[in-house]
């Protein structure tokens, strides 16, 4: 603001102040003079009552007008849309104010275009950033908006409610044991591997820092935590007795033979049963799980003693009479139910 503009502003404020003082001073003279004249008259009480009553009525009327004007002004402001900006001379007579409004509008438009896309990647702790805000050269390892703290908490929830620690089914723990106690019992106690001991201690420190520091989990902390989980998950598989028993069961040939000869289930990919071999083409590789043998093969392998198929196998059936003779022999054989019970 220039010096001339400041001078005009000071003159305006000073003249307004003087005018208000004079107006109030001359307005106070009238009621004071009325009260003084009424007190000198013969009927003092009646005159005083009239003067004071007139002043009270005048004050109430002024207050009513002021309140009504305020309410009317407020109702008029409600009719104006919220997004309306006074830029016309009728709305804003002051020219400098209108120019300031227009300049700020142009500036806001420039800032909107400038800040629409951040210049640098915006990565906040606690959540996986979206691809558009992430570093373009970094590999996207996790889903967008992944909550790191919830993922880490799920590990302790599985340990607490399911007794499962890093896919290890052989977790021996008490109700009062913590995450650090389980890690110590699994990877620290009676362990001579220095690398595993060092990583186990780092794993415990990282977990306690994440869970109890009160700060959001950073991406680096979460990636490090996931690497520890993968590492100790592989280590725990070699120490899980249930997994070892299952592994031995798969590699034990005697178990396969027993399953083939004494049960209707087989895990041997080279089963001597030709009917079971017919189904092997459904598998891309020899299956390691139990495969149920076909009930048709069971029936075919238990031939009743009442049927003699020696001649039929040596002499193929060429005529209708041969087929009828074979059908007659089969009708004399045991039923399907008796064959299954055989």
Curated annotation (Swiss-Prot):
UniProt keyword Magnesium, yes or no: no
Location of this chain's protein in the cell: Membrane
Main location: membrane
Record keywords: Membrane, Transmembrane, Transmembrane helix
Ranges facing Cytoplasmic side: 1-15, 69-342
Membrane topology according to the record: Multi-pass membrane protein
GO cellular component assignments: membrane
Membrane-spanning intervals of the chain: 16-36, 48-68
Protein purpose: Required for growth under high-pressure and low-temperature conditions.
Protein family per UniProt: Belongs to the DLT1 family.
Protein known as: Defect at low temperature protein 1
UniProt source species: Saccharomyces cerevisiae (strain YJM789) (Baker's yeast)
Biological classification of the source: Eukaryota, Fungi, Dikarya, Ascomycota, Saccharomycotina
């Amino acid at each position: 603001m220039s010096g001339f503009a400041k001078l005009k502003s000071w003159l305006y404020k000073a003249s307004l102040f003087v005018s208000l003082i004079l107006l109030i001073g001359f307005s106070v003279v009238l009621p004071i003079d009325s009260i003084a004249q009424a007190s000198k008259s013969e009927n003092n009480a009646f005159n005083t009552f009239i003067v004071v009553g007139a002043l009270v009525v005048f004050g109430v009327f002024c207050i009513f007008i002021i309140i009504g004007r305020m309410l009317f002004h407020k109702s008029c402001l409600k009719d104006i849309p919220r997004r309306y900006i006074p830029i016309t001379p009728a709305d804003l007579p002051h020219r400098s104010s209108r120019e300031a409004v227009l300049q700020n509008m142009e500036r806001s438009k420039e800032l909107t275009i400038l800040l629409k896309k951040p210049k640098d990647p915006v990565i906040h702790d606690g959540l996986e950033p979206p691809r558009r805000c992430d570093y373009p050269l970094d590999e996207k390892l996790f889903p967008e908006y992944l909550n790191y703290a919830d993922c880490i908490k799920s590990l302790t929830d599985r340990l607490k409610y399911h007794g499962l620690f890093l896919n290890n089914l052989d977790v021996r723990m008490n109700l009062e044991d913590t995450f650090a106690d389980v890690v110590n019992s699994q990877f620290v106690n009676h362990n001579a591997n220095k690398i595993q001991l060092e990583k186990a201690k780092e794993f415990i420190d990282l977990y306690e820092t994440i869970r109890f520091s009160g700060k959001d989990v950073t991406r680096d902390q979460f990636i490090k935590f996931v690497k520890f989980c993968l590492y100790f998950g592989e280590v725990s598989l070699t120490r899980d007795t249930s997994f070892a028993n299952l592994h031995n069961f798969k590699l034990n040939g005697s178990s396969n033979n027993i399953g083939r000869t004494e049960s209707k289930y087989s895990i041997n990919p080279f089963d001597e049963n030709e009917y079971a071999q017919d189904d092997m083409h459904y598998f891309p590789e020899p299956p390691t799980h139990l495969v149920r043998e076909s009930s048709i093969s069971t029936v075919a392998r238990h031939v009743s003693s009442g049927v003699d198929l020696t001649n039929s196998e040596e002499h193929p059936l060429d005529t209708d009479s041969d087929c009828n003779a074979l059908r007659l022999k089969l009708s004399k054989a045991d039923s399907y139910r008796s064959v299954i019970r055989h």
